[in-house]
Swiss-Prot record:
Organism expressing this protein natively: Pyrococcus abyssi (strain GE5 / Orsay)
Gene name per UniProt: aroB
Protein origin, superkingdom: Archaea
Protein name in UniProt: 3-dehydroquinate synthase
Enzyme Commission (EC) number: 4.2.3.4
Keyword Zinc recorded: yes
């Protein structure tokens, strides 16, 4: 499993020194350039090649990857060189994809600067770019390190905290310990200083991924809320943020759990509402179902759902379309 380090950014030089890279490149976006890039370059002694791409999910494409590969070639980047992804989920996804494919694999490190990336996108080795759908082209490639520092959350806009909060709620459904820790959190601003919740969320993901790196079995529980979530994102042309789509997906999964297993969906609805995340389906149920059928999570053309049986207990099964239409209609 990757080396996940909870530590201040000042520990970066010693982490990098252990890898002894030939060259170092840092991939970030134009929003983070002014916030964190200069600090990272300064920490690494200045001999760093910065690569800056536009901010946004719509730039997570094969065209962007080609531009980054071009820059790495011009920089004389080798397999023994280190690419650091500094940013949120878009950056870690595309940095991982580029590092895994350039010369069949370079050194890779992540400094996730958003809550979403810290608890989800930067953990577990999934990389990808969007192509007729979210992350349709990608690899499994574990980074050499993930440096998680809550200091990067100090500059994170509230909307991005909320974006990551949906994934934390997902872990609370999957794990009783995260659910317990969330009980005394009144609003999303408190998460900036709750390393314990971030750490526990990461631990849940790490435990699952260690059992099933390539998503052949148990890892699929991490897709809780994502079957509906990815369909919403796709239909919006990725204008709706990942977490805001997943929060609706979590409600749909909870409602399915209620119908199939008498799961108390109120526990999930309460969490989603407490953090002011969306609860209503923004598109017609039939459109959502059509988008789902194209998703990577559709197995043999069937729509496979991750369904809570109780907090900390999950079922994975294909759901009849009529039941799905009924549940989606209830949250429209």
């Amino acid at each position: 499993m990757e080396n996940i380090i909870f530590s201040p950014l000042s520990s970066l030089p010693s982490i990098v020194e252990e890898l002894n890279p030939y060259k170092i490149a840092v991939l970030t976006n134009d929003m983070l350039k002014s916030l964190w890039l200069d600090k990272i370059i300064e920490l690494l002694g200045g001999d760093v090649f910065p690569i800056v791409i536009p901010d946004g999910e719509e730039y997570k494409t094969i065209e962007t990857a080609i531009k980054i590969w071009d820059e790495l070639v011009s920089f004389g980047f080798t397999r023994k060189s280190l690419l650091i992804g500094l940013g949120g989920g878009v950056i870690t996804d595309i940095a991982g994809f580029v590092a895994s494919t350039y010369m069949r694999g370079t050194l890779l490190g992540f400094i996730p600067t958003t809550l979403l990336a810290q608890v989800d996108a930067a953990i577990g080795g999934k990389t990808g770019v969007n192509f007729h759908g979210k992350n349709m082209i990608g690899t499994f490639y574990l980074p050499n390190f993930v440096l998680i520092s809550t200091e990067t959350l100090s500059t994170l806009p509230r909307i991005e905290l909320l974006n990551g909060m949906a994934e934390v709620i997902k872990y609370a459904i999957l794990d009783k310990n995260v659910y317990r820790l969330l009980q005394d959190v009144k609003n999303v601003e408190e998460i900036r200083n709750r390393e314990d919740i971030i750490r526990e969320s990461v631990n849940v993901k790490v435990r699952v991924v260690e059992e099933d790196l390539k998503e052949s079995g148990k890892r699929r529980i991490l897709n809780l809320g994502h079957t509906v979530g990815h369909a919403i994102e796709k239909l919006s042309g990725y204008k709706i943020k990942h977490g805001f789509a997943v929060s609706v997906g979590l409600i749909a999964a909870a409602k399915l759990g209620e119908k199939l297993y008498n799961f108390d969906s109120g526990k999930v609805i309460e969490l989603v509402e407490r953090f002011n995340l969306p609860t209503k389906l923004p598109y017609p149920p039939k459109d959502i179902i059509e988008a789902m059928k194209l998703d990577k999570k559709a197995w043999y053309g069937k729509i496979v759902f991750v369904i809570p049986v109780e907090i900390g207990r999950i079922s994975i099964e294909d759901v009849p379309e009529e039941l799905l239409l009924q549940v989606l209609g209830e949250i429209r």
